């Protein structure tokens, strides 16, 4: 995600949001959150909305924790390191993000630093809405992701993209996804 936390960071909050969106009204969910002292969730949801210039310009966070070897727990992050930055077009087409990525990769490579943030102290595993303090545990770069210049907007690549899937459960035991949100995702 391009936000450091998952505003609906517990399975219960996520379930409630889906339930109220389908069976009731999103306004009732908003009222419930405010009346139960969870108004900060609404603020986080509003703050997560943005109009990014390009997926290649964004910072990304796993938002949920993962095992890191036998003893450690981490969150993952991708930090853009490309020199080129896109600008927001005056008119946003439905596929403006794809257009921006293609414009970038027509002329420039893209790159990201891949980092891990080690869990320290009481940093929670079960609530993905809580941001782990980066001053207490800064991200440590462990790799660089390099995306060379290329044309990816082709019918063949679009067809391939429709067949791809991702599950955090497809991980080696040393990198098992942790926390309730991840347990629900791999169930």
For the regions a language model picked out, list residue spans one by one.
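Active-site-adjacent core segments of small-molecule enzymes
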Residues: 1-187
């Amino acid at each position: 995600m391009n936000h450091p936390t998952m505003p609906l960071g517990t399975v219960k909050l996520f379930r409630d949001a889906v339930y109220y969106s389908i069976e009731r009204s999103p306004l009732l969910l908003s009222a419930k959150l405010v009346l139960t002292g969870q108004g900060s969730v609404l603020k986080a949801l509003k703050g997560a909305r943005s109009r990014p210039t390009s997926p290649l310009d964004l910072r990304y966070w796993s938002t949920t924790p993962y095992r890191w070897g036998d003893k450690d727990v981490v969150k993952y992050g991708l930090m853009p390191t490309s020199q080129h930055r896109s600008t927001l077009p005056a008119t946003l087409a439905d596929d403006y993000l794809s257009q921006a990525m293609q414009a970038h990769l027509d002329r420039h490579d893209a790159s990201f630093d891949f980092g891990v943030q080690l869990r320290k102290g009481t940093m929670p595993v079960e609530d993905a809405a809580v941001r782990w303090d980066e001053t207490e545990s800064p991200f440590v770069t462990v790799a660089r992701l390099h995306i060379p210049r290329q044309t990816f907007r082709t019918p063949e690549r679009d067809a391939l993209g429709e067949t791809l899937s991702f599950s955090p459960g497809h991980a080696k035991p040393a990198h098992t996804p942790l926390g309730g949100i991840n347990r629900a995702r791999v169930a």
